A protein has these predicted regions:
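Small/polar glycine-rich anion-binding or flexible loop at a beta-alpha turn
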Residues: 182-190
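Basic, often amphipathic N-terminal segments
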Residues: 1-77, 92-180, 193-212
Length: 212
C-alpha cells in the first residue's frame, strides 16, 4: 500500500516524503487553506459564488515550461528543502497572468476567512517583517509580492538523500519536465477536519474571453 516510489527511491523513504503532499493532494496553492468565518451552508454557497466570479475574470493561459526545483522550508526549527515543480522564469506575460490570478484569489476570498489563532501564527515562525505582515493581514505569509507558484512533490528532504531523490524524480517526471502547464481552472477544496485529507468540492473554469 501507499504511494508508488519512483525508481531509485526506497518505498519507506518515499512514503515519508509523500505523506504531507498526499494529505493536500497534487495542487498549486493560490489561496492558502483557511477556516470559514461560519460553517453555515449559506457561507459555503457564497464562497463558491465568489470563486466562480474570480474565475470568470481571468482567461486561461500556458505557463512557462516546468522544471523540478528545491525550495526552502522551515521544518522542526531548521531550514530544510523540498522538491516542487515550478515554471521557468522569464515569461513576463505568463508571470503577470499568474500574479493577477493569485492576487484576486487572496484578496477577494479573504472576507470568508476566520481570523488566525495564535497557534497558527506561532507555527509559521521564524518570519521576516514582510512575511509576518502578510500572515496577519491575509492568513498566509507567501502571498502577493512573496508568492511563487509551485506544485509541491515532497516533504522536507533528508540532506544526505536530496540529490538521489531529485535525480529519481527528474527521471520519473520526464513526460512533464520542460512542458508548459495549462492554467484553465481553479478548484475549491474542503476539509471537515484538519486530520483528514483535502477533498475537491468544485472546479471553476477560467472563463474570460476577448479583452473584457
Amino acid at each position: 500500500g501507499g504511494p508508488v516510489a519512483p525508481a531509485g527511491v526506497e518505498h519507506d523513504l518515499w512514503t515519508t516524503l509523500a505523506k504531507t503532499p498526499a494529505h493536500y493532494g497534487l495542487h498549486a496553492t493560490l489561496k492558502a487553506p483557511f477556516e470559514l468565518r461560519s460553517t453555515s451552508e449559506g457561507m459555503l454557497a457564497a464562497l463558491r459564488e465568489a470563486c466562480r466570479k474570480v474565475a470568470e475574470r481571468h482567461a486561461s493561459w500556458l505557463t512557462a515550461p516546468l522544471r523540478l526545483q528545491r525550495l526552502s522550508v522551515h521544518s522542526d526549527e531548521r531550514l530544510a528543502s523540498f522538491l516542487a515543480l515550478v515554471p521557468r522564469q522569464g515569461d513576463a506575460a505568463s508571470e503577470s497572468a499568474m500574479a493577477a490570478l493569485e492576487r484576486d484569489c487572496v484578496t477577494e476570498l479573504d472576507r470568508f476567512r476566520a481570523p488566525l489563532d495564535q497557534r497558527d501564527v506561532d507555527r509559521r515562525e521564524p518570519l521576516s517583517r514582510d512575511e509576518r505582515r502578510n500572515l496577519l493581514r491575509w492568513g498566509y505569509h507567501h502571498v502577493l509580492d512573496l508568492f511563487r507558484f509551485h506544485i509541491t512533490l515532497t516533504g522536507p528532504l533528508p540532506p544526505e538523500r536530496a540529490a538521489q531523490v531529485e535525480a529519481a524524480l527528474n527521471q520519473y517526471l520526464e513526460p512533464v519536465i520542460d512542458k508548459p502547464l495549462a492554467m484553465d481552472s481553479v478548484c475549491l477544496f474542503c476539509q471537515t477536519d484538519r486530520a483528514l485529507p483535502f477533498r475537491l468540492t468544485t472546479r471553476f473554469a477560467l472563463a474570460r474571453t476577448g479583452n473584457a
